[in-house]
Amino acid sequence: MVALADYPQIAAGKVRQLHAVDDEHLLLVASDRISAFDHVLSTPIPDKGRVLTAMSVFWFNLLSDVVPNHLVAWDDPRIPAEVRGRALLVRRLEMLQVECVARGYLTGSGLLDYQRTGAVCGVVLPEGLTEASRLPEPIFTPATKAELGAHDENVSFEAVAEAVGQELAAELRELTLRVYGRAAEHARERGVILADTKFEFGVAGGGALVLGDEVLTPDSSRYWPADGYEPGKVQPSFDKQYVRNWLTSAESGWDRASDTPPPPLPDDVVAATRARYVEAYERITGLDLADWPSPAA
């Protein structure tokens, strides 16, 4: 029986690690780790790795008629039993060093850019927009892929074109917005707003663009409950915002500006964060996380 130790680890991020399987395949393993403010917290969130993996599989399958993806299998003899349910067997790709972000609503770093300049990544927006405003149409707001521990930096479309070429940049923009549009439509049908999301693309043999990494998970996307949507204020969300809020509260006792690592998360914050991740999966997919993984998934 194969073990994870049989596969050399070739990369590790805050949440995932990548192992070499053979010349054509990699094993992408999601952990229960959670990061905030560029720190990996010492307290894991139970089942988070399963949610990220199951949700990626759901979206890869749903979007397969829109864009090819790197998923080979989620249930395969080459996947060690110790990571089954939170690991994907994927194709090797030549990944592009561009974070392809689509935004349908104004929040986060996009809102900060807009407040400073009236634009996001060079895309000029109407006056009078506020927190959580729905944009007239979704926009492509790319970012550079930062090294571990550093911040991604929002850049203009022109900067992407300079880095990868005008034709490929235009293809990335068109594909990003097309995938976002399909995903946002599905989420809306499930009573959820997909405010924004990040995609990563790679190039396969022949030069075709392929969707890689994770896709449309609570770690890479902002999901809001549609029934409580109210522009002008911060929206409740199905992601790690609850953790961020606790870390910046007086209760945590942590000074974000200090060099000290964040404190361990209390049990109630862990439970509430887990519940948000699980709810995101179950609302979006209509499936029960308790059934993942199963041969019928």
Curated annotation (Swiss-Prot):
Matching CDD domains: SAICAR_synt_Sc
Single GO MF descriptor: ATP binding
Listed EC numbers: 6.3.2.6
Database matches in InterPro entries: SAICAR_synt/ADE2_N (IPR028923), SAICAR_synth (IPR001636), SAICAR_synthetase_CS (IPR018236)
GO cellular component: cytoplasm
Keyword Cell inner membrane set for record: no
Pathway the protein contributes to: Purine metabolism; IMP biosynthesis via de novo pathway; 5-amino-1-(5-phospho-D-ribosyl)imidazole-4-carboxamide from 5-amino-1-(5-phospho-D-ribosyl)imidazole-4-carboxylate: step 1/2
Chemical reaction(s) catalysed: 5-amino-1-(5-phospho-D-ribosyl)imidazole-4-carboxylate + L-aspartate + ATP = (2S)-2-[5-amino-1-(5-phospho-beta-D-ribosyl)imidazole-4-carboxamido]succinate + ADP + phosphate + 2 H(+)
Alphabetical GO biological process terms: 'de novo' IMP biosynthetic process
Keywords, comma-separated and alphabetical: ATP-binding, Ligase, Nucleotide-binding, Purine biosynthesis
Matching PANTHER family: PHOSPHORIBOSYLAMINOIMIDAZOLE-SUCCINOCARBOXAMIDE SYNTHASE (PTHR43700:SF1)
Similarity-based family: Belongs to the SAICAR synthetase family.
NCBIfam families: PRK13961.1, purC
Protein name from the UniProt record: Phosphoribosylaminoimidazole-succinocarboxamide synthase
Protein's organism: Saccharopolyspora erythraea (strain ATCC 11635 / DSM 40517 / JCM 4748 / NBRC 13426 / NCIMB 8594 / NRRL 2338)
Organism taxonomic ancestry: Bacteria, Bacillati, Actinomycetota, Actinomycetes, Pseudonocardiales
Record gene name: purC
